[in-house]
């Protein structure tokens, strides 16, 4: 069990070479336009994404993929991979999903997870497939996987905000400390989210992401 936990820490580490730190998911444009301009507004922005996207889209699909992979249900795996890509409302968000998936498809075999052609295709569709596949291979508990996934996203996004607003490193750590208190409730909500309601509910982020694609000066990829 301890080894599974250690594998999980590696999976969500900021040092993992999958490009998690290269995207702002619309945050850069939101800061440019003054929507996010302080620690308080950044915290509100991230909290809205946690409740309106992670809890209702990413974590429920991550759970579905992990369960379907464990059962060997390839049709359901394909359905949820397709669903995940279709749920990314902007070109920028779809590219991030695919490009991180491609990076995972290169990395996982180096970590002992062999991918046949079908699995490789699915991983290249969405990074969630990589997380689910690794969890099944390394016997990682679903609740721990979901908690770690949210933490990894939160850490990367807070650090992006620290650079862009800008905020001090201590302010970033204080924000992480506070927002982490929401993670158990987010994970719990995702466990009981109705399958027919799976989707994203963050229109401001979608607008920011679409506008970021043509933003004149960018630090983050589009």
Curated annotation (Swiss-Prot):
<dbReference type="InterPro" id="IPR002639">
    <property type="entry name" value="UreF"/>
</dbReference>
<dbReference type="GO" id="GO:0016151">
    <property type="term" value="F:nickel cation binding"/>
</dbReference>
<dbReference type="Pfam" id="PF01730">
    <property type="entry name" value="UreF"/>
</dbReference>
<dbReference type="InterPro" id="IPR038277">
    <property type="entry name" value="UreF_sf"/>
</dbReference>
<keyword id="KW-0996">Nickel insertion</keyword>
<keyword id="KW-0963">Cytoplasm</keyword>
<dbReference type="GO" id="GO:0005737">
    <property type="term" value="C:cytoplasm"/>
</dbReference>
<comment type="function">
    <text>Required for maturation of urease via the functional incorporation of the urease nickel metallocenter.</text>
</comment>
<keyword id="KW-0143">Chaperone</keyword>
<protein>
    <recommendedName>
        <fullName>Urease accessory protein UreF</fullName>
    </recommendedName>
</protein>
<comment type="subunit">
    <text>UreD, UreF and UreG form a complex that acts as a GTP-hydrolysis-dependent molecular chaperone, activating the urease apoprotein by helping to assemble the nickel containing metallocenter of UreC. The UreE protein probably delivers the nickel.</text>
</comment>
<comment type="similarity">
    <text>Belongs to the UreF family.</text>
</comment>
<keyword id="KW-0843">Virulence</keyword>
């Amino acid at each position: 069990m301890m080894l599974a936990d250690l594998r999980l820490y590696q999976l969500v580490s900021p040092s993992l070479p999958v490009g998690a730190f290269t995207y702002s998911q619309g945050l850069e444009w939101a800061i440019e336009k003054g929507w996010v301009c302080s620690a308080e507004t950044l915290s509100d922005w991230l909290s809205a994404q946690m409740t309106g996207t992670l809890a209702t889209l990413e974590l429920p699909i991550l759970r579905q993929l992990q369960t379907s992979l464990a059962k060997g249900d390839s049709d359901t795996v394909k359905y949820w991979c397709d669903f995940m890509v279709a749920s990314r409302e902007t070109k920028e968000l779809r590219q991030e999903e695919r490009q991180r998936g491609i990076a995972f498809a290169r990395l996982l075999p180096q970590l002992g997870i062999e991918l046949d052609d079908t699995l490789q295709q699915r991983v290249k569709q969405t990074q969630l497939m990589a997380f689910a596949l690794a969890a099944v291979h390394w016997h990682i508990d679903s609740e721990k996987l979901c908690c770690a996934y949210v933490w990894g996203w939160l850490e990367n996004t807070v650090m992006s905000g620290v650079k862009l607003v800008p905020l001090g490193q201590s302010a970033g750590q204080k924000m992480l400390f506070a927002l982490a208190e929401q993670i158990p409730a987010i994970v719990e909500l995702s466990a009981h989210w109705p399958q027919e309601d799976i989707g994203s509910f963050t229109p401001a982020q979608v607008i920011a992401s679409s506008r970021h694609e043509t933003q004149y000066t960018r630090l983050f990829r589009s």
